[in-house]
């Protein structure tokens, strides 16, 4: 497997991405879970094939998990840059 080059981050960028990841893992996942639950409950009376809200919630979940994975990859392979490196 090829080793990817590290992502170059400032200290501020690292902190921002770390906060975003924590937010997505907690609040983001909670919100998507609630949205999925609500769409599922609302869909009990409808035909699941035509449940647009359930499909939208599943898409939101896929996007969220993709972003979490992307941030994990960045934060597992980064290099802090400083002004003297620029």
Name each model feature, range by range.
Residues 1-59, 63:
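N-terminal cationic and glycine-rich segments that engage phosphates or anionic surfaces
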Residues 45-51, 78-86:
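Glycine/charge-rich, flexible interdomain linkers and switch-proximal surface loops
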């Amino acid at each position: 497997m090829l080793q990817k080059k590290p992502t170059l981050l400032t200290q501020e960028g690292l902190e921002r991405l770390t906060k975003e990841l924590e937010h997505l893992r907690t609040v983001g996942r909670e919100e998507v879970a609630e949205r999925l639950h609500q769409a599922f409950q609302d869909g009990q009376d409808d035909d699941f094939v035509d449940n647009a809200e359930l499909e939208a919630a599943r898409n939101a979940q896929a996007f969220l998990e993709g972003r979490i994975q992307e941030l994990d990859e960045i934060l597992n392979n980064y290099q802090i840059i400083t002004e003297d490196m620029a």
